[in-house]
Amino acid sequence: MIDKRNKKAVTHISTCLCHSSIPIYGDSPFLNTHRAAMDPRPLVLLLLLASHISTFRQMYFEGETIHFPMGIYGNETTLYMNDIILEGTRANTTTRTISLTTTKKNAGTNLYTVISETGHNATYLITVQPLGQSIHHAYTWAGNTFTLQGQVFEHGNYTRWVRLENAEPKLIISWALSNRTINKGPAYTANMDFDPGNNTLTLHPVLITDAGIFQCVIDQQTNLTLTINFTVSENPPIVAHLDIHKTISRTIAICSCLLIAVIAVLCCLRQLNVNGRGNSEMI
């Protein structure tokens, strides 16, 4: 049996404990904080954030394969790929330059030799379209030299260089050739940017007509050398409109991730603030 003095002492100790900061089950600031941390809403938001980051990292920052039908039209310095579906895969590799020299041996012959300064083993197809017809000439690039059996170019003809890989046409570029005859003249140089991964080849001509067509002057009396320099990059840029699309999508993805993170942090801070206010009121 507890006498009055002991009962008063127990009551005093209980009152002090209840109004002190010593953790007691049910009123502990630690337990309240722990319950706030276990609030499922911030956890769900953080899991959603992790899912977003993982998904968009795989989509936009890793080795994705891009499938897109091309519908690019323009002058003769632009790719014509409206009937071809190209597939490109990003890869982080170095860029190398290959220099090609196409030489017309002499007037009256259709022998052309293409020389690579660096060498590149590949199979190419050149399509010559004289006066609306289509003639295909296939050859294999062995070592540093290969030979094309073609025909004399005439005004309005188009020469298409098609790179073949596993017997599938991967890229096409077109430019026009003029039938103007000169006694002698310099070699005309054009630059091409070639991306095997994205299967794009862009011609940057030196000589451009009013219509934006590259005119390669064919010398009927002397040899004509057309030097084509292009860079092979295996980390290809995406086509312009796809760049815009991916940029917008990537921006939306990043903004959504940031928004989810901010909401999760605010939920945690709000819960901690509520618990802190409740604990201060109790004290």
Curated annotation (Swiss-Prot):
Glycosylation sites noted in the Swiss-Prot or TrEMBL record: 75, 92, 121, 157, 179, 198, 223, 229
Residue ranges of every copy of the Ig-like domain listed in the record: 129-227
Keywords assigned by UniProt, alphabetized: Glycoprotein, Immunoglobulin domain, Signal
Classification via PROSITE patterns: IG_LIKE
SUPFAM superfamilies: Immunoglobulin
Gene3D superfamilies the record matches: Immunoglobulins
Taxonomic superkingdom: Viruses
Signal sequence, start to end: 1-55
Record-given protein name: Putative Ig-like domain-containing protein ORF10
